[in-house]
Amino acid sequence: MGDNGDNKELKQKLNFSYSEEEQEDEGQKEAQESKKVQYHTPERCGHQDSEAKFTPPRTPLNHVCELSTPQVKDRASPDQGLRTPVSRPHTRPETPAPPDKSKPPPHCESPFTPRGHSSQSVISTGKLPSRGSKHLRLTPGPLTDEMTSLALVNINPFTPESYRRQFLKSNGKRKTRRDLEEAGPEEGKVEKGLPAKRCVLRETNMACRYEKEFLEVEKIGVGEFGTVYKCIKRLDGCVYAIKRSTKPVSGLSDENLAMHEVYAHSVLGHHPHVVRYYSSWAEDDHMMIQNEYCNGGSLQAAISENAKSGNHFQEPKLKDILLQISLGLKYIHNYGMVHMDIKPSNIFICHKIPSDSPVVPEEAENEADWFLSANVTYKIGDLGHVTSISEPQVEEGDSRFLAKEILQENYQHLPKADIFALGLTIAVAAGAEALPTNGTSWHHIREGQLPNIPQDLSKEFYNLLKDMIDPDPVARPSAAALTRSRVLCPSLGRTEELQQQLNLEKFKTATLERELKEVQRAQSSKEGQSSPGVTGTHTGSRSTRRLVGGKSAKSSSFTWGQSSP
């Protein structure tokens, strides 16, 4: 009986679904054995103490979510799955240590069957449900915790106010930080308890995400505000461009400057002529931005290569660049923003990679998807100087491409400053000499005179470039007007002509259909005015023709010459 009891006890201990509820009568014995295990495994205890010591501070909400969803935590730290068994302390399987009630149960250290896992979750969370992560996110908590959480949420300045009020109020169940800040006097208690705006980047700092998720290939660019690296994401195997800010984020002012580009990217979304944004995070007090990788480099690099060989972009290519960037600017301006730093180094080139699958001829159905057939795509990048048109906070870009009215702090026509910079960018791509940063030559260009271009351009195209740098911003064409320019789209006139002809033919067809319906209506009215007797006779003759007429002729052809029975 003693051996059978020991075997039964051993099986129960080896069964990982064995919970505390099933061993209440042996609690004292298990407590003694747990002390022995702790003495035999000092490294494990030291390791847990060190983890508890260096664990970053967490809000109670996040702490409870981690206890209720340990599997999510395991996925977020892939290094735990890569540890070798040597690094783990050796413990006897016959003496599993029960969880310490003074500390959260270590879910990630021992496997559990669903039964044991659920029982441990219920014990660890107390009155909270086992699936508390979703429950806690959707259920409003105490007002103080809610305000603390809202203090760690940025407000995107480029989000339209109507959109923000419509979608961020959560049907009145949960208020945003701005709603709490704009509360009336009757809610004075809420205003007094509102925490100060905190540095979200520093509070949400992520350690070693760059090294864990990406493989750095090479450095592809260095700018005033950051360094760009070509990286491969370990999970999906795709290539991305990761931008790391040069200066660390040390306060709210630095955070706002670092977040400016992220705000603009997140609101703009995806457009074929704007460098695509994927993700951003703070790491070691530096801003990290994950963007689309453009395999053709920058337009400035291409211009430098052409200058070495004595070549320049020819007029057809210049028109293509101008048209594509105009489409990107039109998209940005329609969102109520301006770039404010258009120049060759902020325009990037993407070469279409040929597919291994058989090529299927495709026809662009509208103006929006014509770029799918283009072998080279030009995109606008580096949105660090983007500002709002309605509430401008202008930070001057490169003085070589800066419009004069911006220096005079005239912000009434901000989109036209992008047009001015784009005109000079095309002139540089055409082979113009290096632009001045100040002096007489600088003012000469601001008077509407293009720099010397070492190639002959068509009169229409040259005049278009001059219009783009007109001293009067009102006289400059808009980005939308450039996309409809006959100079950039010669086929646009033919398309409009064909469209007019098509509309004319549609009108003629509609007129004929209307006349036909009137004739049919008149004919049906005449038939309705006939007498009932005539109508009955006509109907009878019609039914006779239907039953005998046509079909009898066909049957007679088959029975011709045969005698009837």
Curated annotation (Swiss-Prot):
Keywords: ATP-binding, Coiled coil, Kinase, Magnesium, Meiosis, Metal-binding, Nucleotide-binding, Nucleus, Phosphoprotein, Transferase, Tyrosine-protein kinase. Residues 521-534, 553-565 have a biased composition (Polar residues). A motif (Nuclear export signal) lies at residues 317-331. It is found in: Nucleus. The modification Phosphoserine is found at S77. Its EC number is 2.7.10.2. Belongs to the protein kinase superfamily. Ser/Thr protein kinase family. WEE1 subfamily. This is Wee1-like protein kinase 2. It comes from Sus scrofa. The gene is WEE2.
